[in-house]
């Protein structure tokens, strides 16, 4: 791990062996310009494991790469699980490295969500249980590759999700407004410009292409929401809950037009 307490839960590509550019399969689509089989390096991956077209990914048809977030799983696998080795210099470990990436990513995503919940003062009474869950999941993520591969991530998720939901409820209770529940809703292309959505729940909602310009989204819960192409320009996201960097990158924001 990178600190005495917790691993870094955001991607540090400089310490990773380009795992997300090799392990998963890509299907040619609006998100990827080419087909790529699992375990085959992307043609844009350089010898030093950096992307040759990183600054031009959207323009070159690789928007899927822009919105992907491993939550720090890549560097942990490279530096901790495999002790700084990489699949190019030690080909025999390639299969093992690639196999644990989806497992580690899911574990790190859970750790990230727990850390977000631990930042909520309104959920203080849940903090002991959240810390216990965090420590247990982090210990699982620190296991050897052979053990990691067989990890039942769903069993941990089922125990953590109720805590996260309750933390969200406590945080949103004081948001004011109607606090609409759009959990799991199909809101593709919905027009919600300027709407009062304080404390709303968008957990698992499909917000692809939704117009949320100038909306009041303070303390709204975005856990697992699909924000691809959602227009968030001018929206107030102060205190938004469980909104990941990858979700922000998938949406249209004010920074896209600077």
Name each model-derived stretch.
Residues 165, 173-258:
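Tandem repeat scaffolds
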Residues 1-159, 163-174:
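Hydrophobic scaffolds flanking metal-cofactor catalytic centers in soluble metalloenzymes
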């Amino acid at each position: 791990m990178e600190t005495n307490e917790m691993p870094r839960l955001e991607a540090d590509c400089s310490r990773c062996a380009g795992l997300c550019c090799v392990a998963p399969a890509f299907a040619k689509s609006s998100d990827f310009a080419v087909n790529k089989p699992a375990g085959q390096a992307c043609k844009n991956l350089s010898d030093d494991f950096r992307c040759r077209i990183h600054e031009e990914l959207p323009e070159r048809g690789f928007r899927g790469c822009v919105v992907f977030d491993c939550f720090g799983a890549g560097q942990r696998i490279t530096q901790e699980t495999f002790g700084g080795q990489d699949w190019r210099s030690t080909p025999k470990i390639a299969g093992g490295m690639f196999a644990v990436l989806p497992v580690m990513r899911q574990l790190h995503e859970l750790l990230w969500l727990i850390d977000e919940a631990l930042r909520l003062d309104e959920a203080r009474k849940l903090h002991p249980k959240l810390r216990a869950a965090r420590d247990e999941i982090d210990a699982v993520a620190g296991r050897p590759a052979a053990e990691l591969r067989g990890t039942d991530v769903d069993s941990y998720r089922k125990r953590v999700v109720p805590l996260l939901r309750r933390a969200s409820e406590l945080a949103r209770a004081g948001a004011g407004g109607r606090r609409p529940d759009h959990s799991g809703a199909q809101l593709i292309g919905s027009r919600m410009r300027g709407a009062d959505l304080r404390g709303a729940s968008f957990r698992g909602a499909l917000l692809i292409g939704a117009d949320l310009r100038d909306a009041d989204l303070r303390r709204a819960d975005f856990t697992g929401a699909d924000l691809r192409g959602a227009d968030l320009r001018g929206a107030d996201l102060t205190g938004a809950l469980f909104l990941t960097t990858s979700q922000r990158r998938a949406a249209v924001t004010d920074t896209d037009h600077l």
